[in-house]
Amino acid sequence: MRVNLLIAMIIFALIWPATALRAAVSKTTWADAPAREFVFVENNSDDNFFVTPGGALDPRLTGANRWTGLKYNGSGTIYQQSLGYIDNGYNTGLYTNWKFDMWLENSPVSSPLTGLRCINWYAGCNMTTSLILPQTTDASGFYGATVTSGGAKWMHGMLSDAFYQYLQQMPVGSSFTMTINACQTSVNYDASSGARCKDQASGNWYVRNVTHTKAANLRLINTHSLAEVFINSDGVPTLGEGNADCRTQTIGSRSGLSCKMVNYTLQTNGLSNTSIHIFPAIANSSLASAVGAYDMQFSLNGSSWKPVSNTAYYYTFNEMKSADSIYVFFSSNFFKQMVNLGISDINTKDLFNFRFQNTTSPESGWYEFSTSNTLIIKPRDFSISIISDEYTQTPSREGYVGSGESALDFGYIVTTSGKTAADEVLIKVTGPAQVIGGRSYCVFSSDDGKAKVPFPATLSFITRNGATKTYDAGCDDSWRDMTDALWLTTPWTDISGEVGQMDKTTVKFSIPMDNAISLRTVDDNGWFGEVSASGEIHVQATWRNIN
């Protein structure tokens, strides 16, 4: 017994020092971070999200889930330079060629992170994604991201879409707490085979609890409202068809047009913030240089106005709390400079956007969003337009196929403007199509593309003699003549005394749902489920012998 005991004690003495000296990562558990507030932007106009600090920046929860028109691409002013990310508040730097893991405990959502966030224009980062891909991800985080050489990298994890969707559904005033684990090591382990930084022989592992409170939700509403504006050579605007909230207005010595361009709702928990700024910016640099600051102005109430001049004038988050709209004023000189620069037939979504700047977060505090409403700006001399009679950019219909089912009908308003009536007006329908038995049909497809179903389609309008003219128009991209439509004429007189006229008519695009050919696919198979299609209607006008 004594011998056995002695042997056991000797073995223990030999093994214990080896265990005590085994190398491991250095684990540091930081004190809980102070709770931070964030503002969430739900952009229904552009179908993306943005999150930004309501107060202090660190710990970080900041940035958009999609690039906007402000994305930096290697030249010009640096605005948006990464997508959204989180950190533990210490903004810890990473070592070149080391590997990095980040994972969350008590994560509010499964698969919260996509990889290592970096600044897109820094050396070693991806200009397109601002992301360094890891070897693998799981429900808690990502693992095995190699820190590239070049510009600085930090312990930042890029947020997944699932994380943004969680933030979207959080009630204002609610909070979540998660434990952020961040680990880097020089050991070249294989994360795709299950190895992890925390299990390596050396490295640094940091653990910290962070809490974020949703202090506000800004919802940008896409109203799909649409209006036409015709401008003469002196920039004087004339409102055409549409339902956007526009009116002629004079501000000081400038006359022009003002329109409600953004609709929003803003819910808060009482947050006070002045670092968040919102203002419009002209996308066309030549136009921005040609107009004066007061030729484009913006307002939260339509009565008190601020000029547009880069970042000099803005409304703060606190000011936005007392409103639900943003109005924009365009002076006649604004439109005149458009004419001088040859900018015509343009959609306001392509002309300017609104910018969102949070001065607290310079790297990820820039964001851009489109207007809720759309203006179609056209020259009054020799122009043609077509808009939905619902005054929306993307009219849609749905229905059922079978005997007695109603057609899908779309109504449009066609407008021409010139010194005289147009000599010729043509119209055509484009979209997925296939010829069957010598006739062109619009083709609707299932989401998986396996079912392709033919539908006939027609264009019809009332002629001058009161008859209905109908064309077979199966999305075939062929022009049809509608010059003999019944046009309603309104004369106009230019500021120079020159006269002209604006002519309007209506046209209907119809897709029957009760045609027997639509009961089978283009391959002559039966089908069941849902199919869809999208297309466009184009018009063109010609004036001849105009002096």
From Swiss-Prot:
Its main location: other. Residues 1-20 form the signal peptide. The keyword Calcium does not apply. It is found in: Fimbrium. Transmembrane segments: none annotated. Induction: Negatively regulated by H-NS. Positively regulated by IHF and EcpR. Keywords: Fimbrium, Signal. One of its GO terms (cellular component) is pilus. Forms polymers. Interacts with EcpA. Part of the ecpRABCDE operon, which encodes the E.coli common pilus (ECP). ECP is found in both commensal and pathogenic strains and plays a dual role in early-stage biofilm development and host cell recognition. Tip pilus adhesin, which is required for assembly of EcpA into fibers. Belongs to the EcpD/MatE family. This is Fimbria adhesin EcpD. It comes from Escherichia coli O6:H1 (strain CFT073 / ATCC 700928 / UPEC). The lineage of its organism: Bacteria, Pseudomonadati, Pseudomonadota, Gammaproteobacteria, Enterobacterales.
